[in-house]
Each structure stands twice: as C-alpha cells, then as structure tokens.
C-alpha cells in the first residue's frame, strides 16, 4: 500500500473522499498574474511604477520583453498543477515595430499575441485597465479627477478595455473578468471627500455604458484602504465599491485581502458577501503589516479564505486571481510558489470534513469542535498533495526548486 493509499483511508474514516477532492480541484480556474515576472513595468512606457504600489528588490532576470515574459510564464506553468487563467494589465499591450497607441486608443489587435499564447495553453484571459504609471495621471487622480480632459482620457481607456475584454472572451471561449482599480486618493486630509467619489461613480458608469455581452465580460470594482502617497484618503473605498456593485447589475465587487486594515480578515468577509452577491472576485496576496504583496504562502489566512469558499460551495461563484510581486527572489519561483500555495489551500479545504464540523457547531458541541478542528490539521494532506502533483505531471515540493535553478542558470542570468 502506497503512502497515498494509506492517507486516502485515513481521510475516508472522516468521511472525506480524496479522489473527489483532487478531481474538483484540477477544474478550478485560478488567474495567474503576468506582472510578477517583470515587476509591474509593462510594455507601453519606460516610466517608474506609480499608483501607490511598489516592488522591492533587484534580483537578476526580470522579463523585459513580451517574449521573455511569456517564456518565463511557460516555465512557471510547468510547475503548477490545476487550471490557470492568464491575467494581464492594459499596460502589457504589444505593439509592432514603429507602432504605438495610447491607453485611450488601445484595440484588440494590440493583445493578439496574448490571445495566441492563451490559446496555445488552453487558457482564458482576465484583464485590467491600467490606471497608473502614465503621464496623464494628474495629481494622483484618474477617474475621479476634477480635470475633465484627464477624466475623459481615463474613461475612454476603460471603454477600450471593455471591448478588449469581450475580444478575449470570444477568442478563448471563457468569460473575461475585467477589474477596475485606481490608486486615486490624497496624501493628506482632503477638504472634499464626496466630490471625487461622485466623479468616480460617474466615470465607472460611463465605462460600463460601453455595450458588451454580460455573459462574456464580468466587470468588477476593487477597493483599497490606502497606498503609498495616498495614506489619508482613497476614493475607491470598501464602502464605495461594495455599494457600487450592489447598485449596478452585472458589476461585481472585488476584494484583495491586502487592501484592508491588517486586523480585517477577508476570510470573514467571504461568507458575508456570499449572502448578497451571486458572484464576486478575489485577489489573493500576502500582506506583511500593509499591502506589501509578498508571495502567497500557505499561511493561516490563506487557508481560511480557501475554507470559506469551499465549505460554502462557492467555487463556481468566486473568481480567484493571484496578485503579488516580489523582485527580491527568482520571479518564476515566486509566481509558481504562490500558485501552488493556493492550490494547497484549496486542497486542504476540499479534504476537510466540513459537514461534520458544522454539525458540531450547530449542536453547540464547541469543545468537541475545537478538538476535531485540531485533529483535522494533523491528517496526512501532504501525501494527497504529492499524489495530486504526480497526476498533474508536476514535480513535488522537494524537487521543485531544481527546475527553477536550472532555468535561472541557462536563461535568466544571461538577461543582464
């Protein structure tokens, strides 16, 4: 009997079918963010990263061209079990020699190479308008700017992205989640908190007035508590985005678990959201004291978020995407590690006897519940994970970095 077969029997004694869990997991799409591989630089300008976000580190091997980025993503995907979607920002438009279009004039043709990449790997594509790192971010504002010319530019950018999102969905045959997030806000105490939000509301409404198939494009709005240089006031607050999505049919809220106060837990917010929203989106990251976007690991909050999605039968209601960027380590490793961590969290949740534990809570057997929750932590999930990786044709954790190291020595170090 193999170690997996013994683990399978132990789980069966708890009423858990590990075969069913693995079968479910491999079908769950998780969106894979391209910006980990190039430190959120993009291809449409050479300026510095702005928008209240920051990458730290200078590890060699950053992708500097579309070809390099796609090669790195392919290398990372070789190490990932399960189903991945591609997640790109508008700033990753790919232009032919001598060609350029500003963000308000982007067209589907500028993303044709991404579609070819996605089709090659049987992936869907999610999309993000890029409301940062651009000369037309005026005084830190885009969609909420009091300057109508500035605001109009960014509204047109959003509309262009709606059209591009529908192109992605039609080409790949999978819905495209289009996330609207801006870093709009103020460093110090504002004199008017409502005005920028009214302009922001109007701008998003204008973007969503662009005709699109609601079965193909899934717009969402993302909140944030603060960013670098916008510590005192963020236009797109949690209350704003939740209210906007609730009042606009077809628009979802998006929660990034790094975009809240450190003592707020998105795992607690997930079941609350499921009470009211048919669907919503999630950006999964790891914040250390703030929205630092560290590489996702199998930490407590990661596991708790996965639990809430799984035990509330919401795998088909929550659009899951990774969002972090670390320039201090091998970027291919960072991308693959985070993806594998979320797969582990989902697998653990799928291998939890959720109904048994719920029954103990509902019958007020809270002492027994605590003991059983602790006992579940000691079940042999590692053996199930290794079997899942084996079936998916990817390496186990013990040998995971060997492939990364080989790629670094053969490819990445030569880029500098």
What are these regions (language model features)?
Residues 159-162, 174, 197-204:
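Extended substrate/RNA-proximal surfaces in nucleic-acid metabolism proteins
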Residues 189-301:
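Acidic/histidine-rich catalytic cores of soluble enzymes
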Residues 169, 175-189:
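Aromatic- and glycine-enriched pocket-lining scaffold segments that form the walls
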Residues 150-153, 257:
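Catalytic beta/alpha-barrel core
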Residues 183-185, 224, 324:
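Short linear capping/connector segments at secondary-structure termini
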């Amino acid at each position: 009997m193999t170690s997996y077969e013994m683990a399978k029997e132990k789980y069966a004694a708890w009423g858990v079918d590990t075969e069913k869990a693995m079968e479910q997991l491999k079908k769950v799409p998780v969106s894979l963010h391209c910006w980990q591989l190039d430190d959120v630089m993009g291809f449409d300008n050479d300026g510095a990263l702005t928008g209240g976000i920051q990458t730290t580190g200078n590890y060699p091997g950053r992708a500097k061209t579309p070809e390099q980025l796609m090669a790195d993503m392919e290398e990372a995907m070789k190490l990932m079990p399960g189903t991945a979607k591609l997640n790109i920002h508008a700033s990753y438009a790919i232009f032919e020699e001598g060609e350029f279009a500003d963000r308000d004039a982007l067209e589907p043709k500028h993303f044709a190479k991404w579609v070819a990449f996605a089709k090659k790997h049987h992936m869907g594509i999610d999309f993000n308008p890029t409301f940062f790192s651009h000369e037309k971010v005026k005084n830190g504002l885009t969609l909420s700017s009091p300057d109508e010319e500035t605001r109009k530019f960014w509204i047109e950018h959003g509309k262009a992205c709606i059209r591009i999102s529908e192109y992605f969905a039609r080409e790949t045959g999978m819905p495209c989640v289009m996330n609207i997030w801006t870093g709009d806000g103020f460093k110090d105490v504002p004199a008017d908190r409502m005005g920028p939000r009214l302009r922001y509301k109007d701008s998003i409404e204008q973007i969503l007035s662009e005709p699109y198939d609601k079965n193909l494009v899934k717009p969402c709005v993302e909140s944030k508590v603060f960013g670098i240089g916008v510590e005192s006031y963020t236009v797109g607050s949690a209350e704003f985005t939740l209210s906007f999505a609730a009042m606009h049919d077809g628009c979802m809220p998006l929660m990034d678990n790094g975009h809240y106060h450190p003592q707020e837990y998105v795992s607690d917010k997930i079941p609350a959201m499921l009470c009211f929203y048919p669907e919503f989106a999630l950006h999964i990251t790891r914040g250390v004291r703030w929205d630092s976007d560290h590489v996702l690991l199998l930490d407590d909050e990661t596991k708790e978020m996965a639990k809430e999605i799984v035990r509330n039968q919401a795998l088909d209601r929550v659009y899951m995407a990774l969002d972090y960027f670390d320039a201090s380590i091998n970027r291919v490793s960072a991308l693959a590690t985070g993806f594998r961590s979320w797969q582990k969290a989902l697998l653990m949740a799928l291998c939890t006897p959720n109904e048994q534990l719920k029954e103990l809570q509902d019958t007020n057997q809270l002492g027994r519940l605590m003991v059983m929750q602790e006992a579940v932590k000691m079940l042999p999930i590692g053996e199930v994970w290794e079997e899942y990786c084996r079936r998916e044709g990817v390496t186990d954790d013990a040998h995971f970095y060997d492939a990364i190291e080989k790629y670094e020595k053969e490819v990445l170090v030569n880029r500098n």
